[in-house]
C-alpha cells in the first residue's frame, strides 16, 4: 500500500482514495509573470513523478495544476513591458509549457486559469460574507480569521502564536482590518489595474481564493491530494483550508503534500535572492532529462543542493542508464531475479515516493543487466521503471558503416589479426562508439 507523508498530521498515512481506483490531485501551479527557475521546476517534476507512480499502480489520475494569471506581479510586469495583462501572462504560460515539456512532464488533465473563474470566485466570496466568515471594508473583502477555530493547523501553529507575530505589523490594510491576520478575498480596483464588477464594487480576487474556487469547481468539496512547494504551507494553503472549509463545512483535502526546495549554498533558490537559473536558460546547455534526473536524486520532501557537479553527475549517471538500455538482448539469459528488483523498487516508491531509494534500485538493476541478464522481459520492465521518472530512451540504431566496422573487427579478432582489430576499435572510439568484448560477444555503448 502507498504511504504518504501528510503535512496536516505530520505523519505517514495509508493512501485511501475517495473513489476506489481513482486519484484527484490539485497542485498549485505558477504565477505567470516570468520564466520558471529550477526551484519552481522541483514541484512540477516531483508531482509529475508521483502522478506517474499512481498510474503505474493502476490508478486513474485526474491531475489539475492551475495558472495564476491575476496577480500584483503580473500587473506590474505587464505595465513595465507595455502589454495588457492577458497577453503578458499568455507569453509566460506558453514558455512554461515548453519548459516542462522539455523536462518530460506529462500534460495536466486541466490547467485552469483564474480569469476563467471570476463569476465563481465572486459567488464563493458572497457565501463567505453571508455566513459572516468574511466582511467588506472600503471595497475590499477580508476573511475573518477569528471565526476559523482551527486556523493554521496545517502549519502546526495556533492563532495565538500568529497574533503575537503579527502584532507589530502596521500597514494601510491593518487600519481597516478587524484582525492583522485577516486576509484579502477581494481587492478593490486601483487606477489602471485590470478589474471586474462585483457586489463590493470593481476589483479583483486575492491570491488564496483563486485556488480554492478552481479546486472545488473541478473536484467538488473534498479532494484526495493537494500539493505544492513547502513555502505554500503558510499562508497560502493555510488560507485555502480556512476559506474552503468555512464555505462547505467539509474537509478540503484528505492529504497535503509539500516538496522541498532547491538550494544554492544552503539557501533557497528564489527570484527575490537572485540566486536562480531559469529552466529556459539551463536547457540551452543541459538536456531536459538530465535536469529532471538531477531533481529526482532526493526524496521529494528533502532539499536538493544545486551545483554544477551535481548536474554533471546526473548527466554521467543518465548516460550509463542509457547505455544499459541499449545493450543487445540475450534471450537465453537468466532473468529470474527480475521480480526482486521490481519488488524493491515498489517498496521504495510506496514509502512516500522515495525516488532516491528508487533510483538506487534502478542502478542495482542496471549493474545486474550489465552482468549478462538482459532479456526482452527485463528491457521492458527497465523501461517501465525509468518512465516513472519521466526518462524515456529511444532505441539506438548504428549506422551501417559502423556496424560493418564492428563486423570487420570481429573477423580480425577471429583471425588473430589484433593490430587491425585495435585500429578499428580506436577508429570507432573517435566516433564515440566504445566496444566491450565479453564471453557473450561484443557490446557497444555510445560514449
From Swiss-Prot:
Q: Where is this motif: 'HIGH' region?
A: 30-40
Molecular-function GO terms, alphabetical:
ATP binding; cysteine-tRNA ligase activity; zinc ion binding
Q: What is its EC number?
A: 6.1.1.16
The reaction(s) annotated as catalysed by this protein in its Swiss-Prot or TrEMBL entry are: tRNA(Cys) + L-cysteine + ATP = L-cysteinyl-tRNA(Cys) + AMP + diphosphate
Q: Name one Pfam family in it.
A: tRNA-synt_1e
Source organism superkingdom: Bacteria
Name the cofactor(s) required for activity, per the record.
Zn(2+)
What the record notes about the co-factor is: Binds 1 zinc ion per subunit.
Q: How does it assemble?
A: Monomer.
Give the family, as the similarity comment puts it. Belongs to the class-I aminoacyl-tRNA synthetase family.
**Which NCBIfam families does the UniProt entry name for this protein?**
cysS
Question: What protein name is recorded for this chain?
Answer: Cysteine--tRNA ligase
* Gene name, Swiss-Prot/TrEMBL: cysS
